[in-house]
Regions:
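Replace the tail clause
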Residues: 1-330
Length: 330
């Protein structure tokens, strides 16, 4: 897996003899590769979101023998996971009928959710779209872009929906929301300021520190959103990010895969360390670029002695485009 916390849980728990013994004693354990079986992943991710209000990977689901979920979560540290295994085993032994009843109810709710809007047909009324957009705009973070709080995932589908709403209604609020979020992500640490392409999500509300894995589907969807924004408005940042994201997809995920295929993701970890290929210190910049250029780059990209990530390292950000002409005149 590309996900950092998937690596952590695999090492802490699944490779641990004590945890393995507890799992094998009380459960039939199945590990699903979501890239090979996205259909299975989608079913249990819907259950995880429905039961917890959020989703993510690693995804941990406990099922009845017929495959119906009754308890779901994501990452658990070893001690908490051992406690959870014990509690689930005890509950299954002593209250099995209640668990099965709950799982039946959850399965019924998931089937209802999957059936779509009540009375829905091929046409969606404009009024329904307007109400949906109004609800989305109420949730936007007007200070940092995006919708809701941390962690923040790139809202590619919402950006595309807002652009389509703008095309239909010429709503300035919809376009402003796209510009606010598009700018914030493209200038933040979630976007690779050197190599192009977006990371999976931001752990904070200001798009500063990402979870560093890069996913094919995220970047394909964001390419579409930024290209749509650029085509409709001519915004130079949108044009630049769309071009860089396309180049990242072709060079990093396309050229290194078999013919006519793409690599599905880039790992968050390198040499066992999260994000090590994406973070910098002021000293590293001066070592690579020299004293003057290194200090200038640190200022441009927000690289400080204190750092924004771990151990005094900083994720590159680009709060404003550099004045290259003034730099050359020095």
């Amino acid at each position: 897996p590309a996900c950092h916390w998937c690596h952590v849980m695999a090492h802490e728990s699944f490779d641990d003899d004590e945890v393995a013994a507890a799992m094998n004693a009380g459960f039939v354990c199945i590990k699903v590769d979501r890239e090979e079986r996205p259909d299975i992943d989608a079913v249990y991710m819907n259950a995880t979101v429905a039961l917890t209000g959020q989703g993510g990977w690693p995804m941990t689901c406990f099922l009845t023998p017929n495959g119906r979920p009754f308890f779901c979560g994501t990452y658990y540290p070893k001690a908490a996971f051992l406690q959870l295994l014990s509690a689930i085993s005890e509950t299954w032994r002593e209250r099995r009928a209640e668990v099965e009843q709950a799982s039946d109810h959850i399965a019924a709710e998931l089937r209802s959710m999957a059936s779509g809007l009540p009375g829905g047909g091929p046409e969606v009324a404009p009024e329904l779209c307007d109400d949906a957009v109004a609800g989305v705009l109420r949730e936007q973070d007007t200070a940092h872009g995006g919708f809701g709080g941390a962690p923040k995932f790139p809202p590619s589908a919402l950006l595309e929906a807002l652009m389509r709403h703008y095309e239909r209604t010429r709503s300035p609020a919809a376009l402003e929301a796209v510009a606010r979020t598009g700018n914030a992500m493209a200038r933040g640490g979630i976007y690779d300021q050197l190599g192009g392409g977006f990371a999976r999500y931001s752990v904070d509300g200001a798009w500063v520190v990402p979870h560093f894995e890069k996913m094919l589907y995220d970047n394909a969807l964001l390419l579409r959103a930024y290209a749509h924004w650029a085509r409709r408005t001519g915004d130079p940042l949108a044009r630049r990010v769309a071009a860089q994201t396309a180049r990242f997809l072709l060079d990093e995920l396309g050229s290194k895969a078999p013919a006519d295929m793409f690599t599905s993701s880039l790992d968050a970890d390198a040499d066992g360390r999260e994000g090590s290929t994406y973070v910098w210190t002021p000293v590293q910049l001066t070592e690579v670029l020299g004293g003057d250029d290194g200090r200038w780059a640190a200022e441009v990209f927000g690289v400080t002695e204190a750092g924004t990530f771990e151990h005094g390292t900083s994720v590159l950000q680009l709060p404003a485009d550099p004045d290259d002409a003034a730099r050359l005149d020095r």
